[in-house]
Amino acid sequence: MATKIEWTERTWNPIHGCTEVSEACQNCYAKVMAKRLQGNHIKSYEEGFKVTRNMDVMREPYGWKKSSMVFVVSMGDLFHDDVPDTWLNPVMRVIEKTPQHTYQLLTKRPWNMEEYFLRHPVPKNVWLGTTCENSRHYDRIDALRSIRCNNVKFISCEPLLGAMNDINLDGIDWVIAGGESGSRARRTPVEWFRGLRDACLRWNAPFFFKQWGAWGEDGVKRSKYLNGSLLDGQEWRQWPRVANNI
């Protein structure tokens, strides 16, 4: 499915649903959307945000003619504790059989990702990512870093909920950052974004600033579209160096 998410081109949800695991989950957009779809009697969401397979879309990537960047499971966590290998294996088979696409796997449970890829090869056309919203979750980055492969490894700091100036980006190929959206959005001070950006510059890691979200650079709450995505007057939309060759 085409998407407006700035750092990808399509979303694919052969599995959806999740449970809260950390601070970033507090205002989960996917949970709200899943409940809305359930209320609209969409068959695949009849159980709401419960971790569920959606076999109806499993073969979707075969029909995409244009090579695409694909965010896998935007409506949940592919490596949730309740997702067994018997669900993951068919997803990986589709990925391997569609090498024209690049698949972005983003999880808040990188230990499960690490364990899975100890048992199975990492497809060449995947990027592996984890969410890290503040310094309390640096261990997720360590788990991601420990996965033995040459694939792009990336971090999503959205919503950014704490200063991360001292982040270790050794072995990390890309950092995404953004503020929270929605009526209950928590404000991210400009200093936190600057600190993360400057850390990326020190580590020579491409930095992608997605959005301010509901709170602007000036600390005023307004539409995320009005707040835009300029940090200190500049757009930061850097990509992993390999992306130039895709």
Task: State each model region's role.
Residues 1-71, 241:
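N-terminal [4Fe-4S]-dependent radical SAM core
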Residues 1-16, 20, 37-40, 161, ...:
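Auxiliary Fe-S-binding modules of radical SAM enzymes
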Residues 25, 34, 105-107, 138, ...:
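Intrinsically disordered, low-complexity sequence elements enriched in Ser/Thr/Gly/Pro
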Residues 40, 47, 117-118, 222:
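Charge-rich, low-complexity amphipathic helices
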Residues 53-208, 215:
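Conserved AdoMet/S-adenosylmethionine-binding subsite of the radical SAM
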